[in-house]
Amino acid sequence: MNWQSERIWIELITGSRKTSNFCWACILFLGSLGFLLVGTSSYLGRNLISLFPSQQILFFPQGIVMSFYGIAGLFISSYLWCTISWNVGSGYDLFDRKEGIVCIFRWGFPGINRRIFLRFLMRDIQSIRMEVKEGLYPRRVLYMEIRGQGAIPLTRTDENFTPREIEQKAAESAYFLRVPIEVF
């Protein structure tokens, strides 16, 4: 979502609260819970899941391995749920032509650096850089090249932009900031 006037441009950034992350967290949780229940039922010798008799799976080695996969999956699932609840990666980009400043804000993981806030002058922006890699897994990322600080990404690496969309976004950013576009 964007909001733009003649002098101010605010772009809201979606973090980890995406539909795909919710789906993967649910699938991983349910799958790992199933693995853990099968491993536990083979250890106890009881049917905790009524799909098949527990006597078909021996505890050693299949039950131990399934329990291990279930526990590992629950850890990964809890990590995904934590990143979703903390909304890691969300924030905004603020470009203020009137004040001549650019502010980039992102939420991180809990701790000292939970709030990531970058602020610099518009006159320090050298260019908008587009990095395009084609192939089996195409990657199109937009960077803002800043004097003395290097390149700061404006788009996520996992966003799948079409060539037309990334060009449009680069052109809008370069036009608003009045800087050139570089393509790598």
From Swiss-Prot:
Keyword Ribonucleoprotein: no
Family, as annotated: Belongs to the Ycf4 family.
Keyword Ribosomal protein appears in the UniProt entry: no
One Pfam family in the UniProt entry: Ycf4
Cellular component terms per the entry's GO annotation: chloroplast thylakoid membrane; photosystem I
Membrane-spanning ranges: 22-42, 57-77
Subcellular location: Plastid, Chloroplast thylakoid membrane
Membrane topology qualifier: Multi-pass membrane protein
Keywords of the record: Chloroplast, Membrane, Photosynthesis, Plastid, Thylakoid, Transmembrane, Transmembrane helix
Signal sequence segment: none
Taxonomic superkingdom: Eukaryota
Chain's role: Seems to be required for the assembly of the photosystem I complex.
GO BP, one annotated term: photosynthesis
Gene designation per UniProt: ycf4
Name listed for the protein in its UniProt record: Photosystem I assembly protein Ycf4
